[in-house]
Amino acid sequence: MLYILSGTSRSGKTIVAKEFLNKTGIPYMSVDSIMMGFTNGIPEYGIHDRLWPNEIAEKIWPFLKAMCENMIWQEVDFVLEGEAFLPHLIRELLDNNPDKVQVAFMGYSDSNLEEKVKDVKAHSSGVGDWLINEPNDYIESHI
C-alpha cells in the first residue's frame, strides 16, 4: 500500500508519518528531501526550495507520479509526505489504483494567521526547520 500524506505547511504531516512508522514499521520519505535533491543536485530542472508550494507541486509532479506508479507496481509499502501532492494532480493516481493507494490531506481550521505564525515560532524544533529564521510575512505566505 502506498500512503500519501499531504496538506498545508506546518500541519503535522511529518509528525504523523513518523508516528505511523513507529506503529507500523512502514517507512516514509518527505518530498522536501526529494525537492532538495533537485535544488542542489540538478538545479537546471528549475525545481528549488524558493518556489511557492503550488509551483513546486506542479513542477515536481511528473517525477513523483512516475515514482508512485513504480512503487505501486512493485507493491512497496511506503509513506510519502509533503505539500507537493495537490488534489487535482493525485486524483488520477488514486482513481487508477483505489486498492493500492491511500491519501490524506491535513490542515488547520481553528487558527487565525497571526496565531499560527506564533505557533510556528513557539513550537519549532530548529532541526531541519526551514521557516525558523524567516520573517513573519514569509511564514504567513507559506501557511
Residue ranges and their predicted role:
Residues 2:
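Walker A (P-loop) ATP-phosphate-binding motif of ABC ATPase nucleotide-binding domains
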Residues 5:
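Hydrophobic anchor at the beta1->P-loop junction of P-loop NTPases
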Residues 8-9:
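The conserved Walker
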Residues 12:
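Conserved glycine(s) of the Walker
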Residues 15-18, 22-63:
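Conserved substrate/cofactor phosphate-moiety recognition/catalytic segment
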Residues 33-35, 85-86, 108-113:
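Conserved nucleotide-binding/hydrolysis micro-motifs of P-loop NTPases
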Residues 55-107:
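Glycine-rich phosphate-binding loop used to anchor ATP phosphates in small-molecule kinases
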Residues 99-143:
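A glycine- and Lys/Arg-enriched "phosphate-lid" helix/loop adjacent to the NTP-binding pocket
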